[in-house]
Amino acid sequence: MKALKIIGALLIVTCFNLACEKVIDIELEDSKTRIVVEGGVFQYTNTLLNTGYQAINLRSSHPYFGSLDSDYSISGAEVTVRENQTGDLYVFTESETQSGLYETNDLLAKLNHSYTLIVTAMVGDELQHFEATDSISHAAPPMDEIGFHKDSMKDGLNSNNIDHGYLTLISFSEPQATKDYYKFTTYLNDSIIRNDIDGGTQWILLKRDEHLDADVDSVIINDYLIPLEEAGQPIRVEMTLISKETYFYLFTLFENSANAGSDFPAAEVKGNIINLTDPNLYGLGYFHCGSRSDITSTVPE
């Protein structure tokens, strides 16, 4: 009798295991393809950079399980930017060397002006029309000085697990008369510094002036150490004065991406790309404008 009970138990366990190994195929529909816009129109306080060159990148969204190695750039689009105060139109032409990159050398952006991006493109298998508008207010304040603070992990100021390096600091006067929003980008050897620890996120810092006063002595550009290979390397800090709407879009995007624990945001962040063909299928990304100042230095010994 005891032997029968054991056999019965084995049969039950075997049946249970077989049931757990059953594979169920579920077909999931891919979401509709959307346009992704990256770029904008910028005025430079450094006259050497104020050449009239502007660029817009267009690509399409890809399926969740799609290959990251595939080319999702959108080619053959019609891209125009309208200066709203004058009605002047600037046509962007696609780069001969990079698919999906649209450029012009004729748009000298102006302060206190707004600009509207106008795009007609094949997205998926449908011709769609898009618009997006942003503005440039006043000029970004010049950065007076760039400095470096040597740091290590034991100091507790950095968060990217690099043993040693430098924190970048700048000084500039922040006007109190206006409510301003800033985006800082740091370049090492003319390439945007990236945090390889979290999968290649660009090191971009956002600031708003409610946390700053006039005649700011110093601002820590980011809490990440710059991974240095040798002294004398050129470092450039770019500060963009952006609109309030751009600031909160980027802030939400970065915050969601960080909370998700991956490169994908925890929730979809809606930008300013309006789909005139199908308003429910709005574009991803953001068309933003602003004034930029920059400063360059070299890595100290």
Summary of predicted features, one role per range:
Residues 1-5:
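Positively charged n-region of N-terminal signal peptides that target proteins for export
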Residues 21-301:
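A sequence/structural signal for flexible, mid-protein segments enriched
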Residues 17-19:
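C-terminal motif of bacterial Sec signal peptides marking the signal peptidase cleavage site
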Residues 6-15:
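Sec-dependent N-terminal signal peptides
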